[in-house]
Curated annotation (Swiss-Prot):
SMART domains for the chain: ACTIN
Coiled-coil blocks: none
CDD domains for the chain: ASKHA_NBD_Arp8-like (cd10206)
Protein name from the UniProt record: Actin-related protein 9
Recorded family membership: Belongs to the actin family. ARP8 subfamily.
Region (Disordered) location: 148-178
Length: 596
């Protein structure tokens, strides 16, 4: 995508006046790849496409060591403490009072016969189709073609090495002289989530809770290698862009608000250095979401799988002091759904373990999307739950699920969602020595260690933009974010321009619940009496990707783009143009957007 010459300004203006939007998409989006990273999924596609490929952000690697865990996050702490259990029951009762259903202890003692219940069978056509689908275990083998002369001509050492690497004692029964069955070295996407725990694979999630999943058991180098492998596989298998062709492609990287400077730099190195793109630009999800829905000013509420964020955007510029990061998302709603069913003894006596068997999380996510909604009154349905035992076909169990309107209320009562606690990353991961010009060396890092603080609380990112999670509900986060925006006229506009994006934003009844809860959360001293959630013009889970595509296509100046050779040689340096002469921050160089 060549940069226009300085004397072609008028021709560009004439071009924009006459060209059709579809023509701009096809002409400028054909060699522009948009990459939107998330904790659970990564969305990748050409800017001219209607939708991206939505692929689970994980990789399963073949392992030879016996006794090694099948999931790298095996060390996650999911034990609920006594205090957390008390807080969870209290949060349940608060939600029950709002939904006009029986409290937790009342429900368990009085039974379900006397309840006034509503029944659901899937609230939309897509959910009705998905609710009865069954997952199958991934075939971890592949055929290895062998020449008929290979037994006599191949050296014994070479044959032994290849056999010990990934070839099990499984042969093709049809023609053993021409092919063998061997383990696949790497498996990506949903296939990786459906590998049986008995198979010799370890599952890696390079991004967790909105950050690189760096821990003593998962090095930063391996995280970057896995991200590179996942993106490379998508580019090759889904978009069919070879390594040689990528020198003529450009990338728009849409990153979560949770990413810090070092993670952004690592992504630029992966995209430009390892994936061979010609140039790249970085935009944050909040800004991309505004453009994805064709607005300029809005409060963006992004409810992801593991993290939710709130940020306000005014006239195409994100307001850093309005940013809120909440450590829960759609997967926590799934786990809450499982807890409630087990509490009421509605869940079959099967081994459902969302950590050891990610396939169980896929099943719970289907149940959540099909049946969970926010509405008053008892809500039950008959559903088919499947048990997935190691290597065995799925076994169906019909059961009566109850209190299906409570799990999504965890967005407003976060104590209802007890999130996993992740291992602490190494201390040196937080310290980016290339940011000395930001005076971070002169800031208090909290003394020695974390002093028992949460994972990201003690990390000083920059004086104006701390990356700190807040343990408040969604309504309080939205209200606090907008009230931090400043002018009263801007606040009124933002309260009337709330956008819900992300997969969990599809929950039926969530829009009305957000409007009601936010209105009640506004202090009486504020002269604001209107709260409105705007309908999304694009599928909520793809809004940020679509916005990244629009930003990339409309950026005719391309002054904010970083070229491959420039990044590999110079790395982070202040821009040479006037707009960047005082900018030492990576955000100022890589995230700057120029209106055409």
């Amino acid at each position: 995508m060549a940069k226009p010459k300085s004397n072609s300004h008028l021709s560009w203006q004439d071009y924009l006046k006459t060209v059709a939007p579809t023509q701009i998409l096809s002409e400028r989006g054909a060699n522009l790849v948009v990459i939107n990273l998330g904790s659970a999924n990564v969305r990748v596609g050409l800017a001219m496409d209607e939708k991206p490929f939505n692929v689970p952000n994980c990789i399963a690697r073949y392992i030879t060591q016996s006794g090694k865990p099948t999931v790298v996050d095996q060390m996650l702490n999911t034990e609920v403490t006594t205090n957390q259990h008390v807080d969870r029951e209290r949060a349940y009762n608060s939600a029950a009072s709002l939904l006009k259903i029986l409290f937790l202890d009342e429900s368990s003692s009085s039974g379900s016969a006397s309840r006034k219940m509503g029944r659901i069978d899937g609230y939309n056509q897509a959910s009705t189709i998905k609710k009865d689908s069954v997952f199958t275990w991934t075939d971890v083998y592949e055929d290895e073609k062998i020449s008929l002369a290979s037994p006599a001509e191949t050296s014994p050492d070479k044959g032994d090495a290849s056999a010990s690497e990934a070839v099990p004692d499984v042969t093709d029964s049809k023609d053993t002289s021409e092919s063998k069955r061997k383990y696949r070295k790497m498996i990506f996407g949903e296939e990786a989530l459906k590998i049986s725990p008995k198979e010799p694979y370890c599952l890696y999630h390079p991004i967790r809770r909105g950050h690189f999943n760096v821990s003593p058991h998962y090095s930063a180098q391996r995280v970057c290698e896995d991200l590179t492998a996942i993106l490379d596989w998508i580019l090759l298998e889904k978009l069919h862009i070879t390594h040689k062709e990528r020198f003529s492609f450009h990338a728009v990287i849409v990153v979560p608000e949770t990413f810090d400077t070092r993670e952004i730099k690592e992504m630029l190195t992966i995209v430009l250095g390892e994936l061979y793109f010609n140039s790249a630009v970085v935009h944050q999800e909040g800004l991309s979401a505004v453009f994805g829905n064709g607005l300029t000013t809005a409060c963006i509420v992004n409810i992801g799988a593991q993290t939710s964020t709130v940020v306000c955007v005014e006239d195409g510029v994100s307001l850093p002091n309005t940013e809120k990061i909440l450590p829960f998302g759609g997967e926590d709603i799934c786990r809450c759904l499982l807890w409630i069913q087990r509490h009421y003894q509605k869940w079959p006596q099967i081994n459902t373990d969302v950590l050891a068997k990610p396939i169980d999380m896929l099943m719970l996510n289907q149940l959540k999307e099909s049946f969970c909604e926010i509405r008053a009154g008892e809500l039950e349905t008959v559903a088919t739950v499947h048990s997935y035992e190691e290597g065995m076909p799925a076994v169906p169990h019909k059961t009566n699920l109850t209190s299906l309107n409570v799990p999504p209320m965890g967005l407003f009562y976060p104590n209802l969602l007890v999130p996993e606690i992740f291992p602490q990353p190494p201390r040196q991961w937080f310290q980016d020595y290339e940011n000395m010009l930001e005076d971070t060396w002169n800031m208090d890092f909290g003394g020695g260690g974390n002093m028992g603080l949460p994972m990201w609380d003690s990390f000083a990112f920059s004086p104006s933009k701390p990356k700190k999670e807040e343990k408040i509900g969604l309504a309080e986060a939205i209200t606090s974010s907008i009230l931090s925006a400043g002018r009263i006229d801007l606040r009124r506009k933002l309260f009337s321009s709330i956008q819900l994006i992300g997969g969990a934003g599809l929950t039926k009844g969530l829009v009305a619940a957000v409007e009601e809860r936010v209105l009640h959360a506004i202090p009486p001293t504020e002269a604001i009496d209107t709260v409105q959630v705007l309908p999304s013009r694009t599928e909520p889970q793809f809004v940020t990707w679509k916005g990244g595509a629009i930003l990339g296509i409309l950026d005719f100046g391309r002054e904010a783009w970083i070229e491959r050779h420039q990044w590999m040689v110079n790395g982070v340096n202040k821009g040479g143009l006037k707009k960047y002469k005082d900018s030492y921050h990576l955000q100022g160089q890589a995230m700057y957007f120029i209106n055409p």
